[in-house]
């Protein structure tokens, strides 16, 4: 697992009502990348616990993230068919991303919605800084 988590700045362009939870869900999935292959396995029941919503909401968030092109829900052949096993293929980020400390994912004193808001603010900051341009006119 890497020291920091890369989050694309494009995540700020999500438009749904639950975009803060979707941003946090994406970061939680991305935090599970191991050995640099850009695949993350995260059981849905653990994800629902972490985000604090029901299974249906998590499925909706993942569908939104897939439609936005941030994750690919991979399926594996098993027995007589193909099944999704909560393994997600993530894109390689070579520019236009920010990094965050993975301890934010497991921080107990902050709600998932507030964590998503913090990431949304960071995605809109000037690249490489914590400076948010604001024009008062």
Q: What do these predicted regions represent?
A:
Residues 59-63:
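Short, hydrophobic-biased segments on the C-terminal half of alpha helices
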Residues 57, 74-75:
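A generic structural-conservation signal
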């Amino acid at each position: 697992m890497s020291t920091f988590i890369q989050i694309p700045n494009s995540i700020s362009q999500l438009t749904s009502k639950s975009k803060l939870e979707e941003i946090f869900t994406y970061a939680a999935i991305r935090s599970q990348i191991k050995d640099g292959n850009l695949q993350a396995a995260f059981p849905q029941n653990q994800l629902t616990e972490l985000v604090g919503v029901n299974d249906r909401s998590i499925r909706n968030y993942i569908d939104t993230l897939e439609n936005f092109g941030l994750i690919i829900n991979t399926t594996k052949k098993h027995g007589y068919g193909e099944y999704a096993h909560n393994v997600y293929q993530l894109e390689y980020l070579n520019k236009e991303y920010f990094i965050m400390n993975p301890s934010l994912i497991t921080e107990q004193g902050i709600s998932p919605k507030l964590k998503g808001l913090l990431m949304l603010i960071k995605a809109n900051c000037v690249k490489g800084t914590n400076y948010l341009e604001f024009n008062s006119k």
